[in-house]
C-alpha cells in the first residue's frame, strides 16, 4: 500500500504540475520553463516502466507539481490562495476528459497513433520544444477537443488570444490527461482526495524534503 500511495502521489504531482503551468500561462503568458519541458517529455514515453520513469526518473523533476499538490491538499492553504479553487476545477475537468477519452476507442487510438508518429519523427530529427508543443497542441485539437467537453481556461484575455499561448496550454493539458491516465491505471480514484488526503500529503512532504536536501541530487 505504501508503494501504491507513492506512485499515486507522483501521478497526482504530474497532474498538478500540468494545471499550475496552465494557470501560469493563462495569467502571464509565461511559465516555469524546465517544468514545461518535463511535461512535454512525459508524452514522448508511451511504454513507461514506472510512474517516475515518465518524468526522467528524478523526483525533483516533479517539484513544482509536488508543492502544488501539497497546497491543494491543505485546507488552510486553499483558503489563502485565490487560484486554488480554479486549479481544483482543472483537475476534475481533466478527470472528466480522461474518462471520455478512455470510453472513445476511435480518438484514443488516433491519439496513440499520432503520438507514436511524433515520437519516431522526434528521434529522427530532434525537434525543439516549441515545435513539439505546436505538434502536441494539434494532436489535442484532433482528438481531445472532439470529445464533447472542453476545459474553460480563465486568465488574461489578452494572453489567451495569443495563438502561441493557446498551443502551449493545449499541449500542457494533454500532458495532464496523460498523468490522469497513469493515476487511474495505478488505482487513483476521486475519493482519495477526501479519505486519503493525509497519506498522500505525507508522501508528498517526505519527497519534497528529500528534494530540498542539499545532499540530494
Swiss-Prot record:
It comes from Buchnera aphidicola subsp. Baizongia pistaciae (strain Bp). This is High frequency lysogenization protein HflD homolog. PANTHER family: HIGH FREQUENCY LYSOGENIZATION PROTEIN HFLD. It is found in: Cytoplasm; Cell membrane. Its main location: cytoplasm. One of its GO terms (cellular component) is cytoplasm. Belongs to the HflD family. Keywords: Cell membrane, Cytoplasm, Membrane. Transmembrane segments: none annotated. It is a peripheral membrane protein. Pfam families: DUF489.
Amino acid at each position: 500500500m505504501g508503494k501504491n500511495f507513492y506512485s499515486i502521489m507522483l501521478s497526482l504531482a504530474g497532474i498538478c504540475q500540468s494545471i499550475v503551468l496552465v494557470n501560469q500561462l493563462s495569467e502571464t503568458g509565461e511559465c516555469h520553463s524546465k517544468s514545461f519541458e518535463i511535461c512535454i517529455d512525459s508524452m514522448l514515453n508511451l511504454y513507461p516502466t514506472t510512474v517516475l520513469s515518465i518524468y526522467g526518473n528524478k523526483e525533483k523533476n516533479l517539484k513544482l507539481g509536488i508543492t502544488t499538490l501539497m497546497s491543494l491538499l491543505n485546507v488552510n492553504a486553499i483558503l489563502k490562495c485565490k487560484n486554488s479553487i480554479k486549479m481544483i476545477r482543472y483537475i476534475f475537468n481533466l478527470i472528466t476528459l480522461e474518462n471520455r477519452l478512455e470510453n472513445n476507442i476511435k480518438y484514443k487510438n488516433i491519439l496513440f497513433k499520432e503520438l507514436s508518429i511524433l515520437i519516431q519523427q522526434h528521434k529522427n530529427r530532434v525537434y525543439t520544444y516549441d515545435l513539439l508543443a505546436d505538434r502536441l497542441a494539434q494532436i489535442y485539437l484532433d482528438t481531445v477537443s472532439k470529445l464533447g467537453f472542453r476545459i474553460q481556461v480563465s486568465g488574461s484575455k489578452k494572453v489567451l488570444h495569443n495563438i502561441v499561448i493557446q498551443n502551449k496550454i493545449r499541449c500542457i493539458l494533454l500532458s495532464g490527461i496523460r498523468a490522469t491516465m497513469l493515476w487511474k491505471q495505478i488505482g487513483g480514484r476521486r475519493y482519495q482526495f477526501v479519505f486519503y488526503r493525509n497519506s498522500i500529503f505525507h508522501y508528498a512532504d517526505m519527497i519534497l524534503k528529500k528534494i530540498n536536501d542539499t545532499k540530494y541530487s
